[in-house]
Amino acid sequence: MTATFGTIYVIFKKCVSLIAAIMLLVVGADEKNTPAPVGAEVISKDTYVLYDYHMTSQGVTNDGEFFYFSGKKNLGKADIETGEIFRITTNAIPDELEEMGYDHIGGLSCCDGIVYAAVEDGPDYERSCIVLYDAETLKYTGKYYPLPYDLHKEGVPWCAVDVEKNYIYTAEWTNATVLNVFDLDTLELVKTIPLSQPVDRVQGAEMFDGKLYMSCDELDGNKHIYCVDVESGDVQVSFTRNVGAEIEAEGMTVYADENGEPVFCVLDRGARRKSSNLTRYRLAD
């Protein structure tokens, strides 16, 4: 019986590997003619398919050692060097929130061993909250904080922790004109910061070196990365990714390379919505 089970398991693993390889070829062919980014260059790209896709289709953050991913209802943890997922939590939305209608995990941010997740309901987006997970285990800590509806009328697609200021930022999804600033400990609103220009369809954001970087899913396919001065609200284009209108931009994170320079890691859903890509960029000279 054991030998038979072992044989079946080996065959199953080989079949899964073959299917994954075929899917990687297909999604690679879909994206082979993507124009080069403007203002940055691609370092590498990791593609996730099959089961891993459902762990990586929404948000990403990092703590310098690991990536933390979100799918619509799942969480994943990966080695920051290889991108290989080694820990998951499925059905990560707590039961008490599901009973209230929450059904979608969006962008992530993390600090001090806690992953902060933007979670919303749908399709009317009547409720939004920040849910706290343990970064080691990816388990719910028992803490969540509802967000004010008048500042999140289209849900909360992302959140970003500012460790230096002890803040957490959010914004409206469509044509956001202000940055919402909450106290990291209490999630009470501190202030709003007017932005120098609207930012549309922000899907993820992360702080790096005192600046807030945003990944936007503009429908024209440019998919800009914006840099926001959180003191003045000034918004500038950091670089343009040019991944195409068929690709859906998702979350992003930033970490420092061995020289202290930023590495931008941007998550996308493939044109067929059967794969996700984590692309690493460095700014052009």
Language-model features: locations:
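A short helix->beta-strand "capping" segment at the edge of beta-propeller domains
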Residues: 35-54
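Surface-exposed loop and turn segments in beta-propeller and other repeat-based domains
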Residues: 45-49, 87-101, 140-154, 193-198, ...
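Beta-strand-rich domains and repeat architectures in extracellular enzymes and scaffolds
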Residues: 48-73, 104
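Repeated scaffold domains used in trafficking and secretory/extracellular systems
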Residues: 54-61, 98-107, 150-161, 198-206, ...
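Short loop/turn segments immediately following the C-termini of beta-strands
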Residues: 72, 120-122, 171-175, 217-219, ...
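Structural motif
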Residues: 74-79, 124-132, 176-181, 220-227, ...
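Blade-loop segments of beta-propeller domains
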Residues: 85-119
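Loop/turn-rich, solvent-exposed surfaces of beta-rich toroidal or solenoidal domains
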Residues: 197-230
